[in-house]
Amino acid sequence: MAMSLSGAVLSGMGSSFHNVGAKQSGVGTVRVGRKSELVVVAQRKKSLIYAVKSDGNILDDLNEATKKASDFVTDKTKEALADGEKTKDYIVEKTIEANETATEEAKKALDYVTEKGKEAGNKAAEFVEGKAEEAKNATKS
């Protein structure tokens, strides 16, 4: 069973304890005697938990908390990937729709230009025929 100790109890340990390592790794251990091992766990930014490891409970709790955190991050990552896949599918669908719309509009524009070109060609032909008729009549007179 793990037993919490106050900082005052640990203040006499001096150079045998380095809390910098605990801050960096999250967990640190220091051998206090031949059988006793001190476990230091970073709980929050500047808060450390000191406990004497006797039967491994502190590490079991820590491992369980780490596993829960890891599972949470894994689940959130899977959700984010699924959302990303949905977003990709939506963008592809909208791109296809935009492409189809642009193609339809281009076809309409082509049909309009073709029709107007035919009308202009017919008017030009009529104009030329009229002028040719006038020229023909002018040469007869």
Swiss-Prot record:
Q: Name one GO cellular component term.
A: cytosol
* Induction (UniProt): Strongly induced by cold. Accumulates in response to abscisic acid (ABA). Accumulates during compatible but not during incompatible interactions with the downy mildew pathogen Hyaloperonospora arabidopsidis, and thus belongs to compatible specific (CS) proteins.
GO molecular-function term, one example from the UniProt record: galactose binding
Tell me a GO biological process for this protein. Answer: response to abscisic acid
Subcellular location per UniProt equals: Plastid, Chloroplast stroma
Tell me which residues are glycosylated: N99, N137
Main localization, broad class: plastid
Indicate the quaternary assembly.
Answer: Forms homooligomers which interact with potential stromal substrates in the stroma of chloroplasts. Interacts with the galactose headgroup of the chloroplast lipid monogalactosyldiacylglycerol (MGDG).
Its biological purpose: Exhibits cryoprotective activity toward stromal substrates in chloroplasts and in protoplasts and confers freezing tolerance to plants in a CBF-dependent manner. Protectant against various stresses (e.g. cold, drought and heat stress) by preventing protein aggregation and attenuating enzyme inactivation.
Instruction: Report what the protein is called.
Output: Protein COLD-REGULATED 15B, chloroplastic
List the source organism. Answer: Arabidopsis thaliana (Mouse-ear cress)
